[in-house]
Amino acid sequence: MSASCGPLGTSLTQEILSSLGLADKTAAWGTLGTLRTFLSFSVDKDVQRLLKAIAGQGVDYDTIVDVLTNRSREQRQLISRAFQERTKQDLLKSLQAALSGNLEKIVVALLQPAAQFDAQELRTALKTSGSAEDVALEILATRAAPGLQACLAVYKHDFQVEAEEDIRTETNGILQDLLLALSKGDRESYSGIIDYNLEEQDVRALQQAGESSTAGQWVLLLTQRSPEHLIRVFDQYRRCTGQELEDAIRNCFHGDAQLALISLASMLRNTALYFANKLHQALQETEPNFQVLTRVLISRSESDLLSIRAEFKKKFGKSLYSSLQDVVRGDCRSALLALCRAEDI
């Protein structure tokens, strides 16, 4: 099948219109996250509030949630260090002793450095049968380069083994190829300049790879090209072939290989929509999947959770906040709602 299908570049008007999606626009407060640096931050006051919350007759869950879900991760780390200095106690261990269940897990995730949290999630995914193609791909494909490097460094330190070695041991086939390529952190950064020649070249390469059902080219492009470039390639692939890239993957691959390639393509095509789907799926299970809810809401709270909320409401006709309210019960409910932050009208 030929890749010759008319001009690759859309018109200037189309380029401008395609950039106006609400889910891609930075909020008025300068971030697409729901959680930002707390401007009236006082580490001493927060330490005292947390100490009082766990030192009385009963645990003050509301205060713990209020403090930890209204401070940035950097501020939470400052609170942890200050708590240790002033009380000679470890804040994380103190809160673990006072809490239990899903709220305890959420608080632990909130107090861990991002790299440590990701490293533990990655390790669990690789060591748990059936989840590697999901969580491991998510972590390796959606973290910015500095965060990915930090995660892999912590992984080696905490588990005394390179993540790459665990990937080789615990996975196989195309999934292994994808994870190994992503773990190298070689994805190109977007220069802001559209390379139409490279776009055409990549469309041709994917068409040829689809005709021969070989995985090498798919792995190479999906793990090395920038997401911004790949989105254009995906769109042009559809215009040239009459089918979405994901449909081509379904026709060429089966089983774990198909799942892994489609998952990665979905993350790259629209990261916010991918996470909206993950959250919706977690809420639709017989019991809410708190591991997924916790990982996504915390890891995206300072980057793009507003975008995820917008995609969730657009696709499912109901806000993420209302969905959490309707499904989640128990002490952890207020923490998850606080991370989500607000209703979407």
UniProtKB/Swiss-Prot annotation:
UniProt KW Repeat keyword: yes
GO molecular function, one term: phosphatidylserine binding
Signal sequence coordinates: none
Keywords per UniProt: Annexin, Receptor, Repeat
Keyword Hydrolase: no
GO biological process: cell-cell adhesion
Record Pfam families: Annexin
Residue ranges of Annexin repeats: 41-112, 113-184, 197-266, 270-341
GO cellular component: cell surface; collagen-containing extracellular matrix; cytosol; synapse
PANTHER family according to UniProt: ANNEXIN, ANNEXIN A9
Subunit structure: Homodimer.
Function: May act as a low affinity receptor for acetylcholine.
Family: Belongs to the annexin family.
Protein name in UniProt: Annexin A9
Species this protein is from: Mus musculus (Mouse)
